[in-house]
Structure formats: structure tokens, C-alpha cells
Amino acid sequence: MITPEIKQALTQYTQNMNAPLSFVLQVGEHEKRDELKTFLSDIASVNDKLSLVERDVAELRSPISFALYLNDEPTGIIFSGIPSGHEFNSLVLAMLHATGTDMKLDSGIQQIIKAVDSPLQFEVYVSLSCHNCPDVVQALNQFALLNSNITSEMIDGGLYPELIEQNNIQGVPTVLLNGQVFANDKVDTATLVSKLQEFEPDLASKAQPAEQLPLQDVTVLGGGPAGVAAAIYAARKGLAVTLIAEKFGGQVKETMGIENLISVSSTTGPKLTGAMMEHLNDYDVTLKEHLRVTQIEQGDIKKLTLSSGEIIETKTLIVATGANWRELNVPGEKENIGNGVAYCPHCDGPFYKGKDVAVIGGGNSGVEAALDLSGIVKSVTVYEFLPELKADRVLVDQMAKRDNITVVKNAATKQVLATNGKVSAIEYEERETGEIKQQALDGIFVQIGLVPNSQVLKGVVELTPYGEVVINEKGETSAP
């Protein structure tokens, strides 16, 4: 499982470990335990400071659970399952962060986490094919390392079906806090911090203030391609630049296949995001990641209040916050997010293997989702509001070749129906006749486009009713 090439890379990564680290594996019998034991032994072999210990530990839930111990003391980080696939990076980063490698968490966020003074037990349910899950696991692992009141456990849902059933989990990542659902589906570090501040409202006031940045020439909101480009261009002029991003990479990071970036015939969102980060690091740009701007105070010097409580003063503000998934806004949608309603086919598709699902939306995103899901699920029904699909012809032609994809056009989704806490059917209207119909199914993937991330600009600049920024013929907003 651990190839010679990976061992060589791990040897280099771990050469600066500053303390002994143990993988403490729970004793007992399990069909996957030998595989996990070999996996951990191979990793431990790359450095004398790493070791594998088998021990009966009350906090470990099964014989395929292990914890990281630093100097024979628990770090608060637990893995239940074999962290291979996308989660291998989560394990490696946990090892490195525990033994001295600097964390990438913003200093303001670190101060908030250090201020937690009550026990917080996080459980993160993942699938090893989920490309969003590692970000959540890695963030919570860092929380645990920063504060001994916090524990973080990654749980591979594929190896714990009884827990998936018990907790009614139908999408990943799903995060439980002290046994209750804390966050699911569209989760990132900024969301975790925001929800944690809701859970403990006085965290920001208890936290030690982060070091104040000097006056910035340019501050950019948004970490997608547009925001990164703006920051780089400004930095090349010798200006003092800060980039604020809830999630570096933006929507691009969640895109698995990119084939329309001229000069790059094919790439993936994570690869492109990594290249953007490398490019940004070539310049003197301050990156404030996993933070939200909660308030903008106008004036010659603009003041931005961040979710950490930090205030950034800037001469110029560039907003490149992009867009987010558009919601249906029908009864049953929000109530069933994570219980049958999803927005990411790559993340949640595996949970519907052999089941019937719907995709709402007949544009490129919807048809691509249907194509991806058709290789996993029993059947896919695509519902399109308009009389014709708006997806590119090449995608429509591919879809026509799949026997398990059905298309319903001119259909308006009316509500999502659930039984026993799980999605059981969709209700829609045939727009031509007005007839209301229902179709039994197990999951619904919403792919109906995007809405602007412009909430923070309300009252700052003029917006359209849809949240778009109004500009004049010179590209100027209503605010100087």
C-alpha cells in the first residue's frame, strides 16, 4: 500500500520532526486490522522518531482506530479506518503539524481556537473518494493540536455502516460535535469557525487579538482565479497587498475536470488551485485564509472587520468573491441537506450506489453531474425547468448514450419529500399541463447555477435584486 516512492517522500517530509510520535492502535479483531497495521508500520519505518504501539485505549472505538501520541501523550487526533486515498494527506499533515511544522491556519483563527475552554469532541464522517473531506479533517486536526479541550476523529463511513445508519448520514463531510450534527455537505474551515463562534458566542472576545497589519494599499476579497490575479498584478507594482479568502481556489477547487483553460488541455481543480498558490507565493502578498469579512466601513481609508475580530485598513478594495451554488428554495430542501439533498456529486455520489437519484438542472453542471452519477447509481433523472436542455451539445450527446439516465424537461420542482428523516420523493409540476407529479427516489443533487457572493456589499454599493454589482459604462461601482 505504501510504495517505495511514497516512503522516500515521507522520509524527506519527516526529517525535521522535533519529537517522537506514536501511532497507538486499538487492540482487537477486525478483517481490516492487518491491512491497517501494515499501513502504519510502513509509515513508521521511514523515521526513528515514529513508532507503532498496540494498546487498549478507552477513547478508541474499534480495532481499526488509532490515535496520534506525542511524547506518549494523546494529541487529540484519532483516525477510525485506513486514511488512504484523499485522507492520506490528512494523516501526513497531522504527523508534521504535531511534530513542529508550522500550521497554515491564520493567526486570528488560531487565537479563537485557543480560547475554547469547554470539551469539544468532533467526529468527521468521510468517504475516501471525497475531495472536500480532507480540508475539514485537516482543519479540525489543527484545532485539536492547538487546544487540549478539543478532539478530532476521522471516521471512514465505508467501514462503519452502522454509524452511518445510526446518525442518518447521507452525505460527506458530516461533522458531529459532542454527538450532535454540527455541519454537513458544504463545509469548509471558514464555516467551521463561524459555527464554532455560534456554539460559543464569546470566543472572539476571549481570544487574544492577532497582530494588526499596517495600512494596505490594496485588499482583495476572494481567493478564486480572479482574486488571485488581482492580488498578483497589484503586488507586481510594489503595492502592499492582502488577499482575504474563505476558501483559496473558490469554486475552481471543487471542479474535478477542467478542459477549457486555454493552453492547458486538461487539469483538475485541486491541481490548478495548487498552481495558483505557488504563483501567489512568488509575491509579497499577505494571505488571510478561512476568514470572512463581516463589515465594510467606507471612507478614504476603508476598514474591513473579519470574522476573527481583526480589522484591516486599506486604501483600495477589490471584490472578487464570485458565486455559490444556487438553491431551489422549495419546501424540504434545506431541511434535508445531508439527508438526501446534496450539491456535490463527487463527494456524495458514492452514498447512493445502486439507488435512484435526481439531478435538478439541465445546464453543463447538471448534465456533468448526471454523467458522473450514472456510473455509480441505479438511475438518474434530470429535471430541467426549460423546454430544452442548455448544456453543451457534446455533453448532451454523451448523456444520450447512457441507459440509466432519463430527462424530464419543462418541469418545475415544487418540494422535496422525506420519510423517517430521509429524502423519499420529489414533487414537480409539468409546466405545460400544470399537472403535479411525484417520483420516488433516494437522493437529489441540485445543479441550477450560481448566485453572487455579494452579501457583504449590501449597503456598500448598489446591487441588482439578484445581488449583482451595478456598474456604469466605465466599470465603476456606485461607491468611490
Regions found by a protein language model. Give the residues of each.
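Thioredoxin-like thiol-disulfide oxidoreductase module
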Residues: I43-N71, E153-V172, L176-V181, V187-L192, ...
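FAD-site-proximal beta/loop scaffold in flavoenzymes
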Residues: N324, N329, K334-F351, Q447-P480
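Residue-level detector of alpha-helix initiation sites
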Residues: G224-A226, A323-W325, G363-S365
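A Rossmann-like FAD-binding core segment of flavoenzymes
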Residues: T273-T314, V319-T321, S374-E473
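A short, basic/flexible loop-to-alpha-helix module at the beginning of a structural domain
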Residues: E198-Q216, A342-Y352
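Local sequence-structure signature of Cys/Sec-based thiol-disulfide redox active-site neighborhoods
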Residues: T3-S41, V46, I113-S148, M154
